[in-house]
């Protein structure tokens, strides 16, 4: 049975994969994440998830390698990590009363036989109308400077939303576990069977 590798150094993705109670290792993929000028957000996350998984194939032959990538889209534009409090406030002002869509690309690459499975999962976050005071307090309390969209849905960010729409709530955090379980089963690695 091939061993499992998560092509990521993200603590959030690691924590999500740990929910499946299967043994895995993490490894940093080496991929240029620069978007191409002609790529849609869906195409970008699909390409990067695939490249991340395949980039580790020579280091991990005979493994199942998981690649994942996510972008946040508001008004047709990819929204990155804010990195500063002012940028976080600006992103939240733009999101207020709007829908922010997250696209998460998922790839499972079997480095033993070259079989690749991919999927893109959308997830919509409906923001309620936020006051300036609410935005300021949220940024001060949560410090979402390294989170695309300037919020942490798994934390205090839940207070910002009217509703969430998507197939799998784990997708919003960065790893669609329902889709991943389906892919793993197709490779003969059912999480429920050890």
Curated annotation (Swiss-Prot):
Q: What cofactors does this protein use?
A: a divalent metal cation
Gene3D superfamilies the UniProt entry points to: 3.90.950.10
User: What start and end residues bound the annotated signal peptide?
Assistant: none
Effect recorded for residue 52 to A: Loss of activity
Question: Where does it mainly reside?
Answer: cytoplasm
A GO CC term attached to the entry: cytoplasm
Q: Which residues form the active site?
A: 69 (proton acceptor)
EC number(s) reported in the record: 3.6.1.-
Cell compartment(s), UniProt: Cytoplasm
Q: Where is this site: Important for substrate specificity?
A: 12, 70, 154
Alphabetically sorted, this entry's keywords are: Cytoplasm, Hydrolase, Nucleotide metabolism
What function does this protein fulfil?
Nucleoside triphosphate pyrophosphatase that hydrolyzes 7-methyl-GTP (m(7)GTP). May have a dual role in cell division arrest and in preventing the incorporation of modified nucleotides into cellular nucleic acids.
Q: How does it assemble?
A: Monomer and homodimer.
UniProt family annotation = Belongs to the Maf family. YceF subfamily.
What is this protein's record name?
7-methyl-GTP pyrophosphatase
What species is given as this protein's source?
Escherichia coli (strain K12)
Gene, per the UniProt record: yceF
């Amino acid at each position: 049975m091939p061993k499992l590798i998560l092509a990521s150094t993200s603590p959030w993705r690691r924590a999500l994969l740990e929910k499946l109670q299967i043994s895995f290792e993490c490894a940093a993929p080496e991929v240029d994440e620069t978007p191409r000028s002609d790529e849609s957000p869906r195409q970008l996350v699909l390409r990067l998830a695939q490249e991340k998984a395949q980039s580790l194939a020579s280091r991990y032959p005979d493994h199942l390698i998981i690649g994942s990538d996510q972008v946040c889209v508001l008004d047709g534009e990819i929204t990155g990590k804010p990195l500063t409090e002012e940028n976080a406030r600006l992103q939240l002002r733009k999101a207020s009363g709007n829908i922010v869509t997250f696209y998460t690309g998922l790839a499972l690459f079997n480095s033993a036989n070259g079989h690749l499975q991919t999927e893109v999962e959308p997830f919509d976050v409906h923001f309620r109308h936020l006051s300036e005071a609410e935005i300021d307090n949220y940024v001060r309390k949560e410090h979402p400077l390294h989170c695309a969209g300037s919020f942490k849905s798994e934390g205090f960010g839940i207070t910002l939303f009217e509703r969430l729409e998507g197939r799998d709530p784990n997708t919003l955090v960065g790893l669609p576990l329902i889709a991943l379980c389906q892919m793993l089963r197709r490779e003969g690695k059912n999480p429920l069977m050890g």
